[in-house]
């Protein structure tokens, strides 16, 4: 598909709650399409619901996009030619558009209460829950004046066309809603405040949005929006109707939509575990799109080069935490050693984990765990033995490795290590192999298990000889001597 010369897409969340991975997937697809086409990515805040919106959630949205590296060309804190980009600051714009729609006969004042609408349906033998019946379309001036004299406050409703409303969805193909299936709908509350049904298409029109990429859950609102776009074009507010692409639902367990109550829906929970942006974005891209049939791992740049919204699959996509974890591990392994060390240092600092290592030693420690972790949070359990206040021998590990055989190993290992003058991994390895494998005739697992438990407190650690080097000579020998005493207790 060839996109128009000036693609303009938007991401327009409401600032409620914590950023959701389904919402972030929508942001990613919009961002990638803008970057692929050389277009513009607009970030707009839909904060017209004062009861639910919060400044904390607004700041969380900024934090989320910045952490992921999804930069916006227009929007909050960046500006642009069609601002302001927070709907709470655009009230006058909406009131002006509503006045023009009413003046042109595209919209009208409706005074009916929900109870009156239900009563009319019942009187006509219809289902009382059918919704609005378009009754106020036909009010006379005197009827309207009488309602106003009663003190009634009207809403403003759009006059829906008496024809089918359809569009060629870029993901789902031809989609049609039959004439009469959507009643005239409210654009404002009775107090005059604009509703989402007005502000969303109104802003898209004024901000010259060309493509609307959004979740499938919003598909039923599309015929209303098409009718509003047509009216906005007729009154000179809109230039065009954008193209629509409804992205597949993200599922959680079973066939249920991933909801805010599902822990894996929380973007920041993944960040706290130690996902890196590259890994999470790669996985989210796969929720409805693929770069190739035989390839799951790719960079953001590679996604941008390949992404076209018409290639998005319409089938629901299930969020699979294990697959997300595996992709994150791949991206961690793809980082340069220096980049990984910097990210790990920052992650540990943020989470209050301090390793008393200088930069060179930390770089060595980071390199030891880079291929052994799935998320950054896994590194702490592997490295915390380097802190004396975190070091403790696990009882199960002691029972396994610090028995009579372990005592014999440590009796041979301690003098061999004591004689090492240049405390570095190759020399440590040579001394232990000579003493334990050559001297005692042990296999490596039997030889090194007691050393690992004595030095790190556990049976699972980074490579042993490098771990001893990082611990340093004095601490290594001190821990191993204490382990030998403990092994003596086990062997008694």
Curated annotation (Swiss-Prot):
Catalytic activity of the protein: tRNA(Glu) + L-glutamate + ATP = L-glutamyl-tRNA(Glu) + AMP + diphosphate
Pinpoint motif 'KMSKS' region by residue range.
257-261
Concerning InterPro entries, the annotation shows:
aa-tRNA-synth_I_cd-bd, aa-tRNA-synth_I_codon-bd_sub2, aa_tRNA-synth_I_cd-bd_sf, Glu-tRNA-ligase_bac/mito, Glu-tRNA-synth_I_codon-bd_sub1, Glu/Gln-tRNA-synth, Glu/Gln-tRNA-synth_Ib_cat-dom, Glu_tRNA_lig_a-bdl
Keyword flag Glycosyltransferase: no
Gene Ontology CC annotation, any one? cytosol
**Key words, A-Z:** Aminoacyl-tRNA synthetase, ATP-binding, Cytoplasm, Ligase, Nucleotide-binding, Protein biosynthesis
Span(s) of short sequence motif 'HIGH' region: 13-23
Q: Which GO terms describe its biological process?
A: glutamyl-tRNA aminoacylation
Q: What is its main location?
A: cytoplasm
Its subcellular locations are:
Cytoplasm
Molecular functions per Gene Ontology? ATP binding; glutamate-tRNA ligase activity; tRNA binding; zinc ion binding
| Binding locations of ATP | 260
> What's the superkingdom here?
Bacteria
Q: What is its EC number?
A: 6.1.1.17
Q: Which family does it belong to?
A: Belongs to the class-I aminoacyl-tRNA synthetase family. Glutamate--tRNA ligase type 1 subfamily.
Quote the function comment for this protein.
Catalyzes the attachment of glutamate to tRNA(Glu) in a two-step reaction: glutamate is first activated by ATP to form Glu-AMP and then transferred to the acceptor end of tRNA(Glu).
Q: How does it assemble?
A: Monomer.
Query: What is the name attached to this protein's record?
Result: Glutamate--tRNA ligase
Protein's gene: gltX
């Amino acid at each position: 598909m060839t996109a128009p010369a000036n693609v303009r897409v938007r991401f327009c969340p409401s600032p409620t709650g914590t950023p959701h991975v389904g919402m972030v997937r929508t942001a990613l697809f919009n961002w990638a399409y803008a970057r692929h086409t050389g277009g513009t990515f607009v970030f707009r805040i839909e904060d017209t619901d004062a009861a639910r919106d919060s400044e904390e959630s607004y700041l969380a949205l900024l934090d989320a996009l910045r952490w992921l590296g999804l930069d916006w060309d227009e929007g909050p804190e960046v500006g642009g030619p069609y601002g302001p980009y927070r709907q709470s600051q655009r009230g006058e714009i909406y009131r002006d558009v509503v006045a023009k729609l009413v003046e042109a006969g595209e919209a009208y004042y409706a005074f009916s209460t929900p109870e009156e609408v239900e009563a009319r349906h019942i009187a006509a033998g219809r289902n009382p829950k059918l919704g609005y019946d378009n009754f106020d379309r036909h009010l006379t001036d005197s009827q309207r004046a009488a309602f106003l004299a009663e003190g009634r406050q009207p809403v403003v409703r759009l006059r829906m066309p008496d024809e089918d409303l359809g569009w060629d969805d870029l993901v789902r193909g031809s989609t049609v809603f039959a004439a009469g299936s959507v009643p005239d709908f409210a654009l404002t509350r009775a107090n005059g405040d604009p509703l989402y049904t007005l502000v969303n298409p109104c802003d898209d029109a004024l901000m010259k949005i060309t493509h609307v990429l959004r979740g499938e859950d919003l598909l039923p609102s599309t015929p209303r929006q098409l009718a509003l776009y047509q009216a906005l074009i007729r009154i000179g507010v809109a230039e065009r109707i954008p193209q629509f692409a409804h992205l597949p639902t993200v599922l959680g367990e079973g066939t249920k939509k991933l909801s805010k109550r599902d822990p894996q829906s929380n973007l920041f929970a993944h960040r706290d575990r130690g996902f890196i942006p590259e890994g999470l974005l790669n996985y989210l891209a796969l929720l409805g799109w693929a770069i190739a049939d035989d390839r799951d791992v790719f960079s953001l740049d590679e996604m941008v080069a390949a992404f076209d919204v018409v290639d998005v699959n319409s089938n629901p996509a299930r969020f699979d935490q294990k697959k997300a974890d595996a992709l994150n591990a791949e991206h961690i392994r793809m980082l340069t050693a220096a980049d990984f060390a910097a990210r790990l240092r920052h992650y540990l600092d943020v989470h209050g984990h301090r390793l008393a290592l200088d930069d060179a030693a930390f770089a060595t420690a980071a390199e030891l765990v880079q291929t052994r972790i799935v998320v950054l949070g896994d590194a702490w359990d592997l490295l915390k033995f380097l802190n004396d206040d975190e070091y403790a021998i696990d009882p199960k590990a002691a029972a396994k490795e610090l028995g009579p055989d372990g005592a014999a190993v440590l009796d041979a290992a301690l003098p061999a290590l004591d004689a090492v003058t240049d405390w570095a991994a190759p020399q440590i390895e040579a001394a232990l192999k000579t003493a334990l494998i050559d001297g005692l005739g042990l296999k490596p697992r039997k030889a090194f298990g007691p050393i690992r438990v004595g030095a790190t407190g556990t049976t699972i650690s980074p490579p042993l000889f490098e771990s001893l080097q990082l611990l340093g000579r004095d601490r290594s020998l001190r821990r191993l001597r204490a382990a030998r005493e403990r092994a003596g207790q086990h062997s008694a």
